[in-house]
Each structure stands twice: as C-alpha cells, then as structure tokens.
A protein has these predicted regions:
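ATP-dependent adenylation/nucleotidyltransferase module used to activate substrates
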Residues: 1-128, 135
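ATP/NTP-dependent adenylation/nucleotidyl-transfer catalytic domains that generate, transfer
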Residues: 113-114, 125-188
Length: 188
C-alpha cells in the first residue's frame, strides 16, 4: 500500500506505466513519441500508446511501474550485495515478451551482467512445471486449486485488462474477501 501511495498504481503493462509516468514528468521524447506517435526525426512511430490508454496520461491518480523495483528488484539487489550470492529467479521466457527477449539475449545464466542472475526455468513452459510437480509428487500451494494460474503482487493490475472472467480481482473477492476489501475498499 505504501509503495502504491508513493509511486502509483501498476496499470496496463510495465512499459505503458513507465511511458505514462515519464510523460507526466514532462519527458518531451516520451510525450512526442508515445503520446503523439512522432519520432525525433519526424517519422511516425508504431510504438505509440493506443488511444484506449491515452486517457491515463491525465488520470486523477499516480501510475507507475516502480512497485516491481521496490518489491522485487531492490530486495534482490540488496541480497546479492550483502551475501555475494547471485539470485536464482523462477521466471519463464514464455511469461512475457520482455522475459523472452532477455532470455534470448542472455540465456539462463547472466553471470557477466551488471547484476548477475540465474534463471534456470527460463526455457520451461507452464505445462513443464505441472508435469514435473506431478511426476515427482512435489507439494504446491493450494491457491492454484482455487482457479489461480499465477501468484504475485495482489495489487498488480498489469495485464488485468486481458483477464477472462472471473478476473483476478473477482477471484480475490471470492477466495480472500478480507484481502480484497483491503485492496479495494479500505482506501476510501
């Protein structure tokens, strides 16, 4: 809650949230290219924010992707600094275009990167995970039996516009009403 109050809500996608935040700070390149679709050379950019999301540039609340840095990246960086160990992260390239791009660039182990990291599950698919759990009878969190496909930050709205019904927030209301109320109602 403190991170959202300080930085803003994570909406649409990390990339869209970053563009919106930078445009609100007055970044002329982002305003020109992402809001109006004009590159610095005057040509049209195909990476313009869609008209559907342009209204968020003037939304009455803060928008940011900083929650990911605050809740995930900074703690991992601190851990690596304090212990000298490389974090092992369980993300898969199939989860997003950005993760796929990074995996194609570095593979599973990016030990030579500015912030070294190991991602041994990068090439796995979700079906591989479930096959492994069944084959080796590995216990897993029961939340996956409640209709959840992913876990993560409960406030996260990244990709929520793509959710089928019941959406993540509708499921949260049904399975964890107190947490849903904290997320949705206790701010009023």
């Amino acid at each position: 809650k403190k991170v959202i109050e300080k930085h803003g809500y994570p909406v649409i996608s990390k990339e869209q949230a970053q563009w919106i935040e930078r445009a609100r700070r007055g970044d002329p390149q982002v305003i020109r290219e992402k809001l109006y679709g004009i590159r610095p050379d005057g040509s049209r950019s195909r990476f313009c924010t869609s008209a559907e999301w342009r209204r968020l540039f003037n939304a009455p609340f803060k928008i940011s992707a900083e929650c990911c840095s605050e809740m995930k990246k900074k703690p991992l960086k601190k851990y690596a600094h304090e212990t000298g160990r490389v974090p092992i992260i369980g993300t898969m390239a199939s989860e997003s275009k950005l993760r796929e791009k990074n995996w194609l660039k570095t593979g599973c182990n990016a030990f030579e990167a500015k912030r070294p990291v190991s991602m041994p599950m990068s090439f796995w698919l979700e079906k591989d995970v479930w096959e492994y759990l069944r084959k080796y009878q590995v216990p897993y969190c029961r939340i996956y039996d409640m209709g959840y496909e992913r876990t993560g930050c409960v406030f996260c709205m990244f990709g929520a516009h793509l959710d089928a019904e019941p959406t993540r927030f509708q499921r949260l209301q049904r399975t964890h009403p107190k947490l849903w109320r904290y997320c949705m109602k206790d701010w009023e």
